[in-house]
């Protein structure tokens, strides 16, 4: 079972960039592992650090600003997560501490992978995202409330509605990844297997 996601209130960091691809999110040299942990240290490695070893922080990159330390909601521009279809991208984001990414649009594969890893991708219109960038930049350290049950983002004195399809919303609310979904039908699977001829088992 994955962690349930119903509502999250967190610090917002504004990454004012469009077409952020998966190689920027987690560069290919860090993809040797197949477990989900440890990738957060290399999130946006080529942007966060001035050296290849990731030891010299780039003071001009927004994730390194003191006011955004501990951020758990990432605000971005259109086509977030484009490029190659590596599942390591949501792994890196969640391992760093992000729970939500808000953007006008996402690459399809990244969008699906995010739900599989309990990272909530929230689509809002370009105009709404513009408003949120203005709000965050004027109020560094502001927190948003993201309510998956009600499908709303509360930011400042405004509320923004978003839509998640019923199946994915059900899975997130109940902490169900693909394994969890399968285990819900464990008895039926066992019954089916027991009915198979011995030579097929």
Swiss-Prot record:
Gene3D superfamilies, sorted: Aconitase, domain 4 (3.20.19.10)
Keyword line: Amino-acid biosynthesis, Branched-chain amino acid biosynthesis, Leucine biosynthesis, Lyase
InterPro entries according to UniProt: 3-IsopropMal_deHydase_ssu (IPR004431), Aconitase/3IPM_dehydase_swvl (IPR015928), AconitaseA/IPMdHydase_ssu_swvl (IPR000573), IPMI_Swivel (IPR033940), LeuD (IPR050075)
Keyword GTP-binding: no
Known catalytic reactions: (2R,3S)-3-isopropylmalate = (2S)-2-isopropylmalate
GO cellular component: 3-isopropylmalate dehydratase complex
Regions annotated as coiled coil: none
Documented EC number(s): 4.2.1.33
GO annotation, biological process: L-leucine biosynthetic process
Highest taxon of the lineage: Bacteria
Similarity remark: Belongs to the LeuD family. LeuD type 1 subfamily.
Subunit structure, as described in the record: Heterodimer of LeuC and LeuD.
Role of this protein: Catalyzes the isomerization between 2-isopropylmalate and 3-isopropylmalate, via the formation of 2-isopropylmaleate.
Full protein name: 3-isopropylmalate dehydratase small subunit
Organism of derivation: Salmonella paratyphi A (strain AKU_12601)
Source taxonomy: Bacteria, Pseudomonadati, Pseudomonadota, Gammaproteobacteria, Enterobacterales
């Amino acid at each position: 079972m994955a962690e349930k996601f119903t509502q999250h209130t967190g610090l917002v960091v504004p990454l004012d960039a469009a077409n952020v691809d998966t190689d920027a999110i987690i560069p290919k040299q860090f993809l040797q592992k197949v477990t989900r942990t440890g990738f957060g240290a290399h999130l946006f490695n080529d942007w966060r650090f001035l050296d290849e070893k990731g030891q010299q922080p780039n003071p001009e990159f927004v994730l390194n600003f003191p006011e955004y330390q501990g951020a758990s909601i990432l605000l971005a521009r259109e086509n977030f997560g484009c490029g190659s279809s590596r599942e390591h991208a949501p792994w890196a984001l969640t391992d760093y501490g992000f729970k939500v990414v808000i953007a006008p649009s996402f690459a399809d594969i990244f969008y699906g992978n995010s739900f599989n890893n309990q990272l909530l991708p929230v689509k809002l219109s370009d105009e709404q995202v513009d408003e949120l960038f203005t709000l965050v930049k004027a109020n560094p350290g502001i927190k948003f409330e993201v309510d998956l049950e009600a499908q709303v983002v509360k930011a400042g004195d405004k509320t923004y509605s978003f839509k998640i399809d019923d199946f994915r919303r059900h899975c997130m609310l109940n902490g169900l990844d693909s394994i969890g979904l399968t285990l819900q039908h464990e008895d039926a699977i066992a019954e089916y297997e027991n009915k198979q001829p011995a030579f097929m088992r």
